[in-house]
Structure formats: structure tokens, C-alpha cells
Amino acid sequence: MTLNDIDLEKRIINIDHQLQRTSDMRYYVESTKTDAGKRKLPINEGVARCFAAIIEDREVPAVEKLIDGYGGFLFYDDKGMPLVAMHWEHRFNNMVDRYNTIYKIQMPNITPHVCRHTYCSNQAKSGMNPKTLQYLMGHSDIGVTMNVYTHLGLEDAADELKRIEALELARKEIEKKADTPPEQLLFRSV
């Protein structure tokens, strides 16, 4: 991700490319895997504040690398090269390993990709419109969003049934009040 991909004023992140690194350490920029992967993501105030802090604290190398015309990367390694997905996986692994050496209850393997699954599941549990979630995830097929990335279980099903039951009770309560002539309800509200 580069500085040009982030618009803090409009609170939008542009996603239309990805940085890759080959086994022989050559860097290149390519398009997203699918056309659906090209998107503009709205961000909330909390995320915008995080990006503002990252940009403010960003350590710029003496010579910023330009890769296929892209520069201003947000994160660099200790050699001044922009971070790629593998760097983030190593960082996650190191955090989990450190945690597991300190605490008795072990943390499972967590990767940046696991975070995508968690985000998707949490948004689905919150009731986000599935098509909106598909767009945010950058999936061309909603089946991938709902069947691969969204993980719901018994507790989620029970919570949803309770929510529906509460809606039904509220509807019945409104119907009881509907026995009062509309004119009388209107008069009382004035």
C-alpha cells in the first residue's frame, strides 16, 4: 500500500494493485487477482486515525524505492525495501511464537489471511448486507464470501433466532396498538 492509495479526507482506500516479490528477491507490482478485487474501500474514523498515525510515524528510507512506477510505500524492512505479504506472515508468526512461549494456553496459528476471514465473519454476524460484504472483500462470487470466508456456528444461529423472535414480539405489540383507530393515535401524538 502506498500513500497515494489512502485518502484520509474522504476516508477511502484505493485497492487496484499488489506488491509481489519473486524468490530471487525481485519486486514487481501487478493488478489484483480479479476485477472485483479492484475497489475503493470506505474506512471508519478509527481506521482513518490508525492510518494517520502510521503515516505520521512512517520511517522513510534515505532513498525511497520506485517499483514499476509506485513509491511512497507505508512500510519498509530494515534494508529499505517495501514489505510484502511474506513479511507480514513472518511478523504474525513471531508474535504467536512469543505469546506461546510465555502463556500456558496456546494461541493457534494466525496469519493476515485469517484476519480477512475474521473480518468477514464479524461483518456477517453484525448483519451487514451480503452484497456489500462481497464488495468489501473483493470477491467476484458471493458464494466465496458467504461459504468460504464467513464462519458461523450454533451460537450465531441461536442469536439470530433470538433476534427474529424479538422482532416478531415487537410486531405483535404494534398490532395490538393498531386496534386503536388511527385518528385517535394521531390525536394522542399531537
Named regions from a protein language model:
Residues 45, 49, 53-56, 90, ...:
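Generic recognition of well-ordered alpha-helical segments
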Residues 10, 23-38, 45-47, 60, ...:
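C-terminal secondary-structure termini that scaffold catalytic or DNA-interacting sites
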Residues 16-18, 46, 78:
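Generic beta-structure capping elements
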